[in-house]
Design a protein with these regions (language model features):
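C-terminal transmembrane helical hairpin of 12-TM major facilitator-type secondary transporters
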Residues: 69-112
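Multi-pass alpha-helical transporter architecture, strongest
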Residues: 164-190
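Loop-to-transmembrane helix entry
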Residues: 32-51, 126-133
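Pair of pore-lining "gating" transmembrane helices in MFS-fold secondary transporters
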Residues: 2-21, 99-103
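Intracellular helix-loop hinge segments at the cytoplasmic ends of transmembrane helices
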Residues: 28, 106-121
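Helix-to-loop junctions at the C-terminal end of transmembrane segments
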Residues: 54-68, 153
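Helix-loop boundary and gating motifs at the non-cytosolic
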Residues: 17-35
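A late C-terminal transmembrane helix in Major Facilitator Superfamily
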Residues: 119-160
Length: 190
């Protein structure tokens, strides 16, 4: 019933959904024409997630300095920019784009999951339940939209996948901006 938590649950679902959809299809994209990379090279594309892991800790520092209300929309927009740039076929654009996408995703998730707990403690006082609800929505979104990403890839290729996932991340950007308009809870400022 708390609107801030509801938006955070949706952000988690949509963000992981887009992330899983993209990285589920990365092997198919890079093993097909024009790349035709062997499996051992395609597997290397998952190393971009190391940058995302670093981004999670950096986003914590950014949240401490600038606040969740500023970091979340920026991270969501970064995710969207990285995603859209993957539409190109040139590797020197696609690889950095996947890195930016991963960085944005991990920053959104780290910010959202921390915000859920802080908002729940300050508001309804049920941090465990809120964290569980976030996890459920996060993984439901990942499995549902990850599957839809495969369908989009099958019918429309990478451009169809990018269209689907860009729609999801655009909603995340909108929801992150809406979170800025929801008044902070008095006890914590979240």
């Amino acid at each position: 019933s708390e609107p801030g938590l509801a938006l955070l649950f949706l952000i988690g679902a949509l963000t992981l959904g887009a992330y899983q959809a993209v990285f589920n299809m990365v092997p198919y994209r890079f093993s097909a024409a024009p790349y035709l990379f062997p499996t051992w090279i395609v597997s290397g594309f998952f190393l971009v997630n190391a940058f995302g892991s670093l981004a999670a800790s950096v986003s914590g520092n950014l949240v401490a300095r600038y606040g969740r209300r500023r970091v979340m929309p920026f991270a969501a927009l970064l995710t969207l920019i990285g995603l859209v740039l993957t539409i190109f076929e040139t590797l020197w654009i696609v690889i950095p784009a996947l890195i930016v996408f991963a960085i944005g995703f991990f920053a959104v998730h780290a910010t959202a999951s921390g915000w859920v707990t802080a908002r729940a403690v300050a508001g309804v006082g049920a941090a465990g339940q809120a964290a569980s609800a976030y996890s459920i929505s996060y993984y439901l979104g990942g499995s549902s939209f990850g599957t839809l990403g495969g369908i989009a890839w099958y019918h429309w290729g990478w451009s169809g996948l990018v269209t689907l996932t860009a729609t999801l991340i655009s909603l995340v950007v909108i929801f992150a901006l809406l979170l800025r308009r929801i008044p902070p809870l008095q006890k914590s400022g979240y």
